[in-house]
Amino acid sequence: MPAHFQHPWRSDFPILNIEREGAPLIYLDNAATTQKPQVVIDAISHHYATNNANVHRGVYSLSQLSTEAFEQTREKVRCFINARSITEIVFTKGATESINLVASSFGEYMFHQGDEIILTIMEHHANIIPWQQIAEKKGCIIKVVPISENGTLDLDTYKSYFNSKTKFVSMVWVSNAIGVENPIKECIEIAHNNNVPILIDASQSIQHLHINVQDLDCDFLVFSGHKIYGPSGTGVLYGKERLLEVMPPYQTGGDMIKKVTFEKTTFADLPSKFEAGTPNIEGCIGLGASIDYINGIGIKDIVLHEQGLMKTAIEAIQSYDFLQILGYNGSNVSALSFTMKGVHPHDIASILDKKGICIRAGHHCAHPLMQFYKVSSTSRISFALYTTHDEIIQCIDELASIYALFS
Ligand code: PMP
């Protein structure tokens, strides 16, 4: 591998040693999913090779070992986001399921005809459709906070939306489509000044920013394991205990009950009440390994490294007038969206693929945001802790060649 592609953390990720199209893999689609370090891969195979049994059920020691390893991850997640208690950490299969859980359970319990829910125009579909579904069922209204051209949330409109009918806010912290960071603490304060609970979609923050849910004081926070160097099919819902306590179960079945008779079922305490059925045991154990891995490096160093990458990318993209960045306001975190004059994003991504460079082309599951920018798709580059400055420069140099080819 050429020296300029080397990075202290890179060698921890076996896939990054693989060549694609005769060149080292340049993976710049980290907002879609991150690559996995060897320690995560090892944790999963170690579990299968030595500890595998179902959790929370067996009195035999193998099941207890499996349960311990699984539950250790809950404590690791609690510590990582500084939740007050492990009762506030619910395992799900991803951010999507976490949001669906809150929308349908909290919505079922709290929403009534004419109530209002606040979202923003930059939400991922996973933070739109669950709210639409419950709004339709309960006769609620969704209000959408706009942004300015550079991606900045319109806080005046946000503030003006609150009234006695407002029941919930659900908002992304960092946009997956344009990388803009919302002033999340301020947004939480505004919601709370109006006595409205707020869910934070931290899918694109958990791997790039330091998160402290007690300091943020958010009511719910969600993320996916696969975006934080962990396995797919794992996710977390953080919720304040007093809210989770009063919410009805989302799914029902084994492992979430105290007692079942054909007349009546009583439900288990938190967090089991929201974890029906056999969970993704090995996935959660892998997630625990990914959190250990991040802690081993230190989120502060990751933040610094990725801020440097953003500076490199912005300067390089802005040096070409045929590239137009969508939604850049200086707050962007590890993702940038752009268009190229006269060239379709899918053509760009296909040509880069032939050079071993993976970037995302499409609507990024954010149709309303694409409609706002009057485009059907964009090209997006997104970074991770193993991304190097040279990879970004090489990718952007290739963009110049593609533009030359098409013009
Ligand atoms: N919200 C945001 C901001 C995301 O980026 C994503 C994934 N792209 C999701 C929600 C949904 O995550 P998942 O598909 O892992 O459930």
Question: How should each PLM-predicted stretch be described?
Answer:
Residues 1-407:
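Pyridoxal 5′-phosphate
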